[in-house]
């Protein structure tokens, strides 16, 4: 089980139930096959989307029920959109769409990491045309050094999206990455399923789960 350090107050970690821990065990196991990896990842992603959407602002609304009564409920107070960091972030798009009745626009960012310097470079950016007026869920399953996510967040800010309107949704993070990201963006909000203690010499999360994109899309 991962042992997180004290985290910024804007970081929400899913409740570490036995069920979630069992899913994380399957996800991390190098013996887990492709179809089981995808099934397990999707279950965790669904949990993350529920938590992320619960953190967004809501407003009261009055509806009529099929029984002839009225009900005071809530509905989102702001429109949202997703932005996935390619390619691994695309694995989280279906979970977001399913949680929002498939009506949420999704943008794409391609950020590549130099395997020698570990620096990130923006290669492609396509956002929904009104992204600056929406709350943005930034999707990337793994957070290692934080360089790619920092570049992605700065790109969103440069496009007119306020830092406080960005929620980073993530499966596995590490302490170093969280520290680096929040040192630059303290108003950011983050939802993750697990926080691992360290990076290895190649700057991969340990214990981690391997290359998430390769395992999810079956290219390993």
Swiss-Prot record:
Going by the UniProt record, its keywords in alphabetical order are:
Allosteric enzyme, Glycosyltransferase, GTP-binding, Nucleotide-binding, Transferase
Gene3D superfamilies registered for this protein in UniProt: 3.40.50.2020
- Sites where the protein binds D-ribose 5-phosphate: 204
On the tree of life, the source organism's domain of life is: Eukaryota
Record has Iron as a keyword: no
Residues holding 5-phospho-alpha-D-ribose 1-diphosphate: 87, 113, 140-148, 211
- Pathway linked to the protein: Pyrimidine metabolism; UMP biosynthesis via salvage pathway; UMP from uracil: step 1/1
Activity regulation annotation text: Allosterically activated by GTP.
Q: Where does GTP bind?
A: 77-80, 134
What is its cofactor? Mg(2+)
InterPro entries this protein is in? PRibTrfase_dom, PRTase-like
Instruction: Recite the UniProt cofactor note for this protein.
Output: Binds 1 Mg(2+) ion per subunit. The magnesium is bound as Mg-PRPP.
Give GO BP annotations, semicolon-separated: pyrimidine-containing compound salvage; UMP salvage
Annotated positions binding uracil: 205, 210-212
Q: Does the keyword ATP-binding apply?
A: no
- Tell me what reaction this enzyme catalyses: UMP + diphosphate = 5-phospho-alpha-D-ribose 1-diphosphate + uracil
A GO-annotated cellular component? cytoplasm
Give the range the annotation lists for the signal sequence.
Answer: none
Which EC number applies?
Answer: 2.4.2.9
Q: Which GO terms describe its molecular function?
A: GTP binding; uracil phosphoribosyltransferase activity
What role does this protein play?
Catalyzes the conversion of uracil and 5-phospho-alpha-D-ribose 1-diphosphate (PRPP) to UMP and diphosphate.
Protein family per UniProt: Belongs to the UPRTase family.
- The identity of this protein, by name, is Uracil phosphoribosyltransferase 2
């Amino acid at each position: 089980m991962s042992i997180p350090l004290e985290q910024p107050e804007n970081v929400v970690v899913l409740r570490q139930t036995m069920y979630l821990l069992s899913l994380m065990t399957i996800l991390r196991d190098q013996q887990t096959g492709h179809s089981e990896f995808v099934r397990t990842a999707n279950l965790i992603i669904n949990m993350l989307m529920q938590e992320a959407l619960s953190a967004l602002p809501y407003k009261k609304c009055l509806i009529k029920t099929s029984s002839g009564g009225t009900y005071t409920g809530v509905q989102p107070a702001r429109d949202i959109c997703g932005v996935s960091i390619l390619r691994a972030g695309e694995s989280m798009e279906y979970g977001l769409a399913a949680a929002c009745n498939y009506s949420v626009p999704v943008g794409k960012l391609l950020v590549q990491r130099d395997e020698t310097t570990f620096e990130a470079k923006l290669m492609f950016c396509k956002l929904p045309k009104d992204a600056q007026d929406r709350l943005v869920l930034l999707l990337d399953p793994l957070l290692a050094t934080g360089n790619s996510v920092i570049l992605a967040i700065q790109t969103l800010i440069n496009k007119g999206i306020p830092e406080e309107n960005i929620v980073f949704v993530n499966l596995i993070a590490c302490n170093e990455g969280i520290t680096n990201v929040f040192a630059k963006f303290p108003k950011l909000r983050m939802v993750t399923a697990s926080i691992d203690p360290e990076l290895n010499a190649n700057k991969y999360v340990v214990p981690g789960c391997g290359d998430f994109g390769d395992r999810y899309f079956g290219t390993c």
